[in-house]
Amino acid sequence: MTAQTPIHVYSEIGKLKKVLLHRPGKEIENLMPDYLERLLFDDIPFLEDAQKEHDAFAQALRDEGIEVLYLETLAAESLVTPEIREAFIDEYLSEANIRGRATKKAIRELLMAIEDNQELIEKTMAGVQKSELPEIPASEKGLTDLVESNYPFAIDPMPNLYFTRDPFATIGTGVSLNHMFSETRNRETLYGKYIFTHHPIYGGGKVPMVYDRNETTRIEGGDELVLSKDVLAVGISQRTDAASIEKLLVNIFKQNLGFKKVLAFEFANNRKFMHLDTVFTMVDYDKFTIHPEIEGDLRVYSVTYDNEELHIVEEKGDLAELLAANLGVEKVDLIRCGGDNLVAAGREQWNDGSNTLTIAPGVVVVYNRNTITNAILESKGLKLIKIHGSELVRGRGGPRCMSMPFEREDI
């Protein structure tokens, strides 16, 4: 089936037709050891090699007939008038936690002077070092301008942007424009707002919104999975809370996007398992990757909607049987990341062995470094497209994290 709407995603495994990426840019070079935790990184990727790896990832998708879109390009194309462009700059500045009126004025002048829209977008992503700004006359400084800190940035970079899965999530024909866990990442959702409001193809109300970035509760796209045209899966995780899920589901059901049930997975709250898709992804009609460490503590709730109310039931019993019953298959194979070896499972999950991108039933993009998990997947009859990711993985995300499907064929 060919999509008749700008967004069409009714599974995790239908043939991928169109996908959104972000090529890592100068924001990566604004990482520094003293502030890694603040920016949600554990290490600093080498940008030149990260870009080569990302370009190879994009080309691997194109080689499979997939149209690759870029976040920075769509955002630039959304600044369709001078008024919208200026509004974007002002909204960006209002969310940037800038210290000092004079500093904010200097940054606004810097951004307004950038004539090319894509260059402007990329600059907002990269952040602004204090050293880039002209010296502000003492007579123009307020108290916050005068009380200088040693922090080198007037505006923080957004180094997590190459994980396009999280700021918004495509669900059916709609989109969840998320309110993210950290202030560092929540600014990323501004690009999605302008794309789905003003872009010639994706804006103007063509795509229903099922969650709004101005909500006070948090949700991220790595916790939103489309298992089938009838069933969604959501994760209650380090980055997504139950209150957000309730709001999301009410909106999805009210907007009649076609879904009948949601499976909510509650699992350990820590950075190793920050999202559902870091421990659980669908790779075929009846196969999933899973990290064995979550299985013991996992709780699953079935959520349906009737008479304008959510109905929630805690599921008991075997996870594979539960998934099989909800997907209408005889049985489900849960493929453990790292197999039965505890050390391999921990290492390969840390390097996103469970975070796979399925581009067609049984055809999966993976990092080549997760050799044990990959061998198990191949032994199950899956076709693997292996990509290098030694620098990309330093951000703690795999092929699914780095991609947001815009169109899949129905299954």
Curated annotation (Swiss-Prot):
<protein>
    <recommendedName>
        <fullName>Arginine deiminase</fullName>
        <ecNumber>3.5.3.6</ecNumber>
    </recommendedName>
</protein>
<keyword id="KW-0963">Cytoplasm</keyword>
<dbReference type="Pfam" id="PF02274">
    <property type="entry name" value="ADI"/>
</dbReference>
<dbReference type="InterPro" id="IPR003876">
    <property type="entry name" value="Arg_deiminase"/>
</dbReference>
<dbReference type="GO" id="GO:0016990">
    <property type="term" value="F:arginine deiminase activity"/>
</dbReference>
<keyword id="KW-0325">Glycoprotein</keyword>
<comment type="function">
    <text>Antitumor protein. Has a powerful and dose-dependent inhibitory effect on antigen, superantigen, or mitogen-stimulated human peripheral blood mononuclear cell (PBMC) proliferation. It may inhibit cell proliferation by arresting cell cycle and inducing apoptosis.</text>
</comment>
<dbReference type="GO" id="GO:0005737">
    <property type="term" value="C:cytoplasm"/>
</dbReference>
<keyword id="KW-0056">Arginine metabolism</keyword>
<comment type="similarity">
    <text>Belongs to the arginine deiminase family.</text>
</comment>
<dbReference type="GO" id="GO:0019546">
    <property type="term" value="P:arginine deiminase pathway"/>
</dbReference>
<dbReference type="GO" id="GO:0019547">
    <property type="term" value="P:arginine catabolic process to ornithine"/>
</dbReference>
<keyword id="KW-0378">Hydrolase</keyword>
<comment type="pathway">
    <text>Amino-acid degradation; L-arginine degradation via ADI pathway; carbamoyl phosphate from L-arginine: step 1/2.</text>
</comment>
<feature type="active site" description="Amidino-cysteine intermediate">
    <location>
        <position position="401"/>
    </location>
</feature>
<comment type="subunit">
    <text>Homotetramer. The recombinant protein is a homodimer.</text>
</comment>
